[in-house]
Every structure is written in structure tokens, then in C-alpha cells.
Amino acid sequence: FSGRKLDTTKWDYQIGTGSQYGLNGWGNEEAQYYTPKNVFVKDGYLVIEAKKEEKEGKSYTSGRVRTMKQDGSPLFTTTYGRIEASMSLPEGNGVWPAFWMLSADESYGTWPLSGEIDIMESRGRLPNRVYNAIHYGQPWPMQKYTSSMYKFPAGQKTTGFHEYAVEWEPGVIRWFVDGNMYYETSSWWTMANDAVEPFEYPAPYDKPFYILLNLAIGGTYDEYRLPNDYD
């Protein structure tokens, strides 16, 4: 990343609580309000900073960016390939950083029918491990997911810089940390509510996806934990 601000020809902000999509708390009962002020570039790195401050009914502010404009038009999408980032993650209760992908056009329907690829997620209170997932199946609440965990070698933590990557090919998705593949799957399906059979495999992972980076606070992912005052 260059300069001091987000390059909005490549990335754009998502703002608010998710209420504009009918998902207050971004569908996970999260405790933050996303603002552009919590995202900046420093020394060549993109920084997302969470703060304890009240904003429009939320107790924290933080940041979320994606390779899609606020109006929903794409800035960057990909179908297949290797997607990677070198990241240093925060430690502490209630912090939930994520590096992930969503369908650019929801070809198969709204979440989770068109899929979600979680390249990396972390629970800040467990700084020696990260997680991945794919989401698919039928409409909520009958959705499915497949997930795995990577545990760092002794002496390493998520607070150091590590490379997180996914390799996405027709019919297979693989996850890597620091070049080490730790999980792969070819098992998924997706089906509309009124359908008799699923969409043709490898749906939904055969359409363009865009990239997201965010730092959430609280919510369902780690049982509603919130940061301690000293975190």
C-alpha cells in the first residue's frame, strides 16, 4: 500500500452497522460501527484500528474495506487463483480480524447460496491459531459450513507478520499459512429453497468473488466477548 490513504481505485470502505442491508451488527451481533477514519496507510501497510468510542448505538468503531465500491460495482474480482496477504493481527478479548471473499454478483442467490471463502479469521484471545471456512448450502437457517484451524509452532503468534493465502481452483480450495498448506476441500454444494437438486457442481465456487478485510468487535464468533479495558 502506498501513500497515507486507502487507494479507492482499488478498495473502498464499507460504513456503518450493516443496517443498510437489514443486518444490524453485520448479521453476527457485532459491537462496532465501521468508519473510514479507522482505516489508514502507514509505512507501506494498511492499518485497521478499532477504538472504544460510542457511535450511533455502538460502543466501538473500526474499519472494513473491500474490492467493491459502496454502490456495489466491482473494483476487483477473481474466479480462481491464489489470493494472499501478509498480516499482523491484534491480540485480546473480543477482537475478530478477517480476510475473506464474497460473491460479486450473487449468481446463485443471497448468502450463503453464492458462497463465502474465509481465508483467515482469528479470535484475538487465542493468538497462536487462525481459522478458515467456506459457507454454502441452503438459505439461512439451513446453511452449511466447512472449517479448519492452523496452530502456529511454539513461540510464534498472530501478532507477528504471517502470510495467509488461499489457492482456488475448479473443484478444490486450499489454505496456507507461511507457505504451508494446512487444509483443502472439494466438498460443497448449494441449492435454492424451492429446488429439488443442488446447482451443478462446483457451484457456488465457479463465479467471480471480491476481497474483504475488516476488524470486528464482539459478536457471535467468540461468544460475545468484548475487549478488556487494558487490551
Annotate the PLM regions.
Residues 2-231:
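GH16 jelly-roll
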